Amino acid sequence: MATTVPLFSQFTCKTPITSSSTSSFQSKSPILLPINPINRRIAVHRHDFKVRASDVNDEWGPDSKGRGGDVDDEWGPEIGLNSSVAEKVAEEAIESAEETERLKRVLAGSLYGTDRGLSASSETRAEISELITQLESKNPNPAPNEALFLLNGKWILVYTSFVGLFPLLSRRISPLVKVDEISQTIDSDSFTVHNSVRFASPLATTSLSTNAKFEVRSPKRVQVKFEQGVIGTPQLTDSIEIPEFVEVLGQKIDLNPIKGLLTSVQDTASSVARTISSQPPLKFSLPGDSAQSWLLTTYLDKDLRISRGDGGSVFVLIREGSSLLNP
């Protein structure tokens, strides 16, 4: 009795055809294999052969898991190592930044009450010098002249070891005139520096300033050439309050009996100050090689700048508006 073979049970086989003209092989009709018990067992259990074949050790290892993670190849271990190194570097950077901010706050606190260094004791000077050295070693911009935009703006002088400024800071000009502010304004686009000393008196304020050009000579050093000096006209103080008494050598002197006389003198002085204030500022040139100097920036960030000048004198400046000005 003939066996009927369903269409989906047929296996098509073709013989290879060679391109050689001498070959005698030709295409033949498909051979239909009848399904018998042996063939059926092969078809049914074919997946068993696949499972056993996957157990064979090849270049990827004993199983597919070894391809991605457990097998040590050129990608696996190094990725983990680089990740650990990156995390450690990031942690060290954060710790260094926090330590720098702490040192800045300590320095600002140490400068308080020193009158820009004039009134600092030897112990305080030594402490400030040590803090400056530590900050210089942590300079976040070791090549500050390659980041000139950080120099832009107005900087307030809060400390110096430059003895040439001490006579000015000691108020030898007049007992009633004091140095109110010393500042430096830098414009890196035009390569200009504007130094200003503002004086204050009971009636008015005035300033002495210099305009200069600077040239970049190295990643840290700039050459400064002063071109012009300016004496600002006095600006009248908005309001003056006469106290009821003053203390002289430990004794209080009552000013009420002569308050009327003082008011009259004040009005006269105010009139003179208004007349002077209407005049233009006095400008004068600064010729010669003596009007040149250089500055070495040893620390720079968005709030704090430390520079060293001729003879090793140090200048500590804080950007206007920074919270470091109010420790």
Swiss-Prot record:
Induction: Down-regulated by drought and oxidative stresses. Up-regulated by wounding.
Principal subcellular localization: plastid
Reported tissue expression: Expressed in anthers, sepals seeds, fruit coats, and leaves. Very low in petals and pistils and not detected in roots.
Keywords (A to Z) from UniProt: Chloroplast, Coiled coil, Plastid, Transit peptide
Disordered: annotated segments: 56-78
Source organism superkingdom: Eukaryota
GO cellular component: chloroplast
Residues forming coiled coils: 85-107
Cell compartment(s), UniProt: Plastid, Chloroplast
Transit peptide segment: 1-84
Function of the molecule: May modulate the action of carotenoids.
PANTHER family reported in the protein's UniProt record: PLASTID-LIPID-ASSOCIATED PROTEIN 4, CHLOROPLASTIC-RELATED
Protein family per UniProt: Belongs to the PAP/fibrillin family.
Protein name: Plastid lipid-associated protein 1, chloroplastic
UniProt source species: Brassica campestris
